[in-house]
């Protein structure tokens, strides 16, 4: 594993019955970079994310995080790894509706045995930079779609993970809000020196990333390509009311 690599999949294969989802995929994620995994539905892109993130085990192949092999770990250790070294942003946020925003963000810390008061203090520090000031006590149902995704971004980053995984993070948002959400996701992740892996079918989303990898029928079709990004704004919290 390269000294500049944070996460590496080697020869990853995964099948579901007769359906081959991954057919021997190699992918390296470097420190601090954003990588888009693109492909149509059923191409294997989400399966690749799940194998890299330790959500599922590949049938064969290896996954290494910071030089350590993780695909052979038991579920308990992989669960702890997902909670501490990885962050996740999903299409619909997956926030707990009964908890205020600040406790949704604090939850990964509390699951890692940080006291509730300390976890909430750490969680609150994310709200201003992400344009969520004053929304700490709101429940998910009181937030717009874009605001809820910003809360999910804060939750993904609160443990200072090595890698953030985002699966169709703008799929439920309108174009303008999705653009703003991707800008914040990329900028906040890079600011915290984490790598970002984004699964998407949308070239506009992929355009925010440093590299694009295309997956089809379980194979990577081409080598990683540089993304074409335009119009990136600076400052996480611009247009924060969406």
Question: Regions from the language model: what does each represent?
Answer:
Residues 38-40:
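The feature captures the beta-strand-to-loop junction immediately N-terminal to the Walker
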Residues 53:
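Helix-to-loop junction immediately C-terminal to a conserved catalytic motif
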Residues 61-69:
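Conserved ABC transporter NBD signature motif
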Residues 83, 138-141, 159, 192:
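Conserved signature/switch motifs of ABC ATPase nucleotide-binding domains
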Residues 99-107:
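Short coil-to-helix segment of the ABC ATPase nucleotide-binding domain corresponding to the Q-loop/switch region
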Residues 139-143, 147-149:
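Conserved ABC ATPase signature
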Residues 164-167:
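Catalytic Walker B motif of ABC-type/P-loop ATPase nucleotide-binding domains
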């Amino acid at each position: 594993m390269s000294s500049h690599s944070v996460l590496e999949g080697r020869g990853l294969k995964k099948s579901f019955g007769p359906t081959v989802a991954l057919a021997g995929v190699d992918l390296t994620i470097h420190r601090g970079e954003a990588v888009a995994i693109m492909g149509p539905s059923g191409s294997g892109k989400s399966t690749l994310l799940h194998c890299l993130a330790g959500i599922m085990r590949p049938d064969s192949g290896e996954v290494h995080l910071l030089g350590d092999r993780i695909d052979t770990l038991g579920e308990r250790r992989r669960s702890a790894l997902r909670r501490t070294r990885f962050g996740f942003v999903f299409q619909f946020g997956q926030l707990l509706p009964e908890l205020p925003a600040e406790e949704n963000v604090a939850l990964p810390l509390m699951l890692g045995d940080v006291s509730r008061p300390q976890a909430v203090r750490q969680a609150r520090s994310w709200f201003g930079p992400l344009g969520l000031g004053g929304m700490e006590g709101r429940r998910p149902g009181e937030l717009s779609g874009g605001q809820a995704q910003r809360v999910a971004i804060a939750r993904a980053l609160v443990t200072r993970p090595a890698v953030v995984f985002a699966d169709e993070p703008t799929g439920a948002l309108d174009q303008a809000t999705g653009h703003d959400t991707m800008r914040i996701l990329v900028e906040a992740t890079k600011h915290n020196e984490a790598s970002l892996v984004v699964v998407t079918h949308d070239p506009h989303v992929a355009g925010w990333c440093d590299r694009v990898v295309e997956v089809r029928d379980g194979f990577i079709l081409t080598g990683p390509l540089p993304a074409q990004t335009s119009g990136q704004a600076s400052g996480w919290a611009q247009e924060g009311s969406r």
